[in-house]
Structures are given as C-alpha cells and as structure tokens.
Design a protein with these regions (language model features):
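Short, flexible loop segments at the rims of nucleotide/cofactor-binding pockets, characterized by
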Residues: 16, 29-36, 100, 131-137, ...
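A transmembrane-helix-recognition feature enriched in membrane-embedded lipid enzymes
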Residues: 1-40, 68, 109-118
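A cross-family acyltransferase "interaction/gating" segment
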Residues: 151-156, 161-203
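Amphipathic coiled-coil/heptad-repeat helices and related helical stalk/stem segments
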Residues: 38-41, 107, 139-143, 169-173
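Structural alpha-helical scaffold elements that stabilize or flank donor/cofactor-binding regions
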Residues: 47, 114-115, 149, 176
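Internal catalytic-core helix/loop-beta-alpha segment
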Residues: 121-166
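Catalytic core of membrane glycerolipid acyltransferases/transacylases, capturing the structured
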Residues: 49-133
C-alpha cells in the first residue's frame, strides 16, 4: 500500500490506519477493563465479502457503539471468536469500514473530527439539527456517498437516527437496502447507556 494511497473519499489510508490503531489502543481498556464487552455471533464476520455489507444497529451512544464495532470486526477478522482480548488485531485493521453519522455530530470538536476521518459518512439529518426539529429533503449526495462506501467496503448504519430508546426507524435505511442491495447484518447493542455517558466518551 502506497503511503499516499487514498480511499474513494480522499482520505489517506496510511493516516486512517494510524488513527484506527491509536483510537483502538486508547479505547481498548474501556471494553476490556473498566467494562467487560460481551460479544455473541461474531463468527459470521470472517465469512462476509469485502464489499457491499450493511450492518444495521440500534444506537445507545454517539461514539462508543461504533468504536466497539471497529474492535469486534477487526478482532473477528484476525480469528478471535467473540473476544477482543489482546489489541494486536489492530496492527493491520480493515480500512474500508464506514459508519453513517450526523454531520453536526462529527464536526463538533477535535475527537469527533478524528473519528470522522477514521470512517464517517457524514450526512445531514432531515428531521433534527442542533436539538431542534427541522423538515428538509434528503440530500441525494448523502445517499450517493453511502452507496460509494458500500461499493468500497462495509457500512454501519443506525436507522433510528438517535440514541434515544424506542424511536421508530427512519425510512432511509430501507431505501439504501432497496437501491444498493447489500448483504444486511443486524446488530443489537445493550448496556452501553449504563456503562457510558450519552456521547460515549466518558466511562
């Protein structure tokens, strides 16, 4: 891999690798020390194709959910079944993992911007922004970027579009599935609200 090779969004892959390693090492103890992440069903990860996979998950924190998935996916690909023991699996992380996130969330501070570079497909929410209700049309460029990410690799999406419990699923995920026809893998997250703050930055 050339040191200046870029992904379809223009991000330098070498820099992305360094950021994923750093974030993984810094966050690992939160899932294997202060908390104990319990994983089930990760055996399917290793058999998935390299592109066009959509993970559909509930959402409990802004960031801890996604970071945990980066750990689990990379650990599973390196042969660790339902375990993230020994952070060495991040030495050669999968670089084509993306996640759908609100643009306002990923531009609010240095750490969110670093997390965005690591894999965010940032979109404008159509119903809410900065804590206020809005009503606007879907940006076709946002849909196109999600399709671009699927063509390149794996995408994580949160169809509720919020960390609040029991919210209905937004229609966007169904549209993405119908349009791009990815392999769909459901994920259930539980207990993160009790273990982390809302943003998933504090224990």
């Amino acid at each position: 891999m050339g040191i200046l090779k870029r992904n379809p969004f223009g991000h330098i892959l070498f820099l992305k690798k360094m950021l994923i390693r750093y974030l993984g090492i810094m966050s690992h103890r939160r899932y294997r020390g202060f908390n104990q992440l319990h994983i089930e069903g990760s055996e399917i990860i290793k058999n998935l194709p390299d592109q066009k996979v959509l993970f559909v998950s509930n959402h409990q924190t802004y960031y801890a959910d996604v970071v945990a998935m980066f750990h689990v996916f990379n650990a599973s690909l390196s042969g660790r079944l339902d375990s993230i023991k020994n952070v060495g699996y991040l030495w050669n992380p999968k670089l084509n993992i993306y996640y759908v996130a609100a643009k306002e969330t990923m531009s609010d501070g240095l750490l969110p911007k670093i997390l965005a570079y690591a894999g965010s497909v940032s979109i404008e929410r159509t119903w809410r922004e900065s804590g206020k209700d809005v009503n606007r049309q879907v940006k076709f460029s946002d849909i196109s970027n999600i399709g671009k990410a699927l063509d390149d690799g794996w995408v994580i999406t949160f169809p509720q579009g919020t960390t609040k419990p029991f919210r209905p699923m937004r229609k966007g995920t169904a549209f993405i599935i119908k349009k791009y026809k990815p392999i769909v893998v459901p994920i259930v997250i539980d207990g993160f609200r009790r273990s982390f703050d809302k943003k998933g930055l504090m224990i």
